[in-house]
Amino acid sequence: MPLQLFGRDQIVVHYDNGNMSNDDQNHQSVLGSWTRRAAAALRTLMNKRIQRITLTHWLLLVIWVTSLWKFTSHYRQLYANSAVFATLCTNILLFGISDILAQSIACFYSYHVDPIPQILNDTFHHVQNNRDVENGGGYESDELSIFNDFTSEHSSYTDNDDYPELDRPLATFKTDTFDFFRWGCFMFWGFFISFFQAPWYKFLNFFYTEDPTVVQVFERVLSDQLLYSPISLYCFFMFSNYVMEGGDKDTLGKKIQRLYISTLGCNYLVWPMVQFINFLIMPRDFQAPFSSSVGVVWNCFLSMRNASK
């Protein structure tokens, strides 16, 4: 009970409510405990697998496909007002679906039976440690894994030479969790290229107008595949290197050397025919969304290709 003097003959008494403070602390402790338990339960629920794919992947896929379905009814009106804005919204949804599919495929294939069960791994540890003790090696190898290299400093022979399957490192399957950062970056890339995609289609339709129809289509396809595709693919790898992966000039050079030419070759196997159909059949206001819709499969491949090591 502290006393505070304000002047002559004036005393103010403050009563400390210690019980209330303790109650508040207990309440906060209980609340924090329940919050942690709820978060853990939610994580467990979202990591539940349906057909080998987590509930998180399924939920996001359903939400984005439903949003795309509802968006289609408003596309014409949006395109009439602004072609860029309509393309922007379309790309965000389609690129989001592409990466969800890519991560779902990776999640599906990450779920398989370990070729070396844990009980065999533990047994191998036990036998190896006992042999080290008998040889006077003590327990220095307690921290070693069955998949470590047991080679001595001056020998090229390993105990695993007779068991090559033990040389494979134990994979840490991180593909069973959804990578929201990668997903967001992929949608941002779709958002970014919308500012170039819509004007590019307008340019092609405006520039090639006097020749017969088939000739116009071939000219547009060649212009698209020889100019737009190589540049946009290179820019995508730059974006993924610097933004998504935090790389530098050296990592970009390695990525381009390892992935660019082969990916561009795959592009030329798919997109010339797609764009020929696009420019020949589709109305002009549906050319961009048509290519983006077909691009769901391509972007899914591109996302997996970029994530490959």
Swiss-Prot record:
Enumerate the Cytoplasmic topological stretches: 74-81, 205-225, 282-309
Location of this chain's protein in the cell:
Vacuole membrane
Stored Pfam families: Mpv17_PMP22 (PF04117)
Q: Which residues form a coiled coil?
A: none
List the glycosylation sites: N19, N121
Recite the UniProt keywords alphabetically: Glycoprotein, Membrane, Transmembrane, Transmembrane helix, Vacuole
Regions of this protein lying in the Vacuolar compartment: 1-52, 103-183, 247-260
TM segments?
A: 53-73, 82-102, 184-204, 226-246, 261-281
Domain of life assignment: Eukaryota
Q: How is it modified after translation?
A: N-glycosylated.
Q: List the disulfide bonds.
A: none
Entry membrane topology: Multi-pass membrane protein
Cellular component, GO annotation: cytoplasm; fungal-type vacuole; mitochondrion; vacuolar membrane
Q: Answer yes or no on keyword Ribosomal protein.
A: no
Which family, according to UniProt? Belongs to the peroxisomal membrane protein PXMP2/4 family.
Name the chain's protein: Vacuolar membrane protein YOR292C
* Species in which this protein is naturally found: Saccharomyces cerevisiae (strain ATCC 204508 / S288c) (Baker's yeast)
Taxonomic classification: Eukaryota, Fungi, Dikarya, Ascomycota, Saccharomycotina
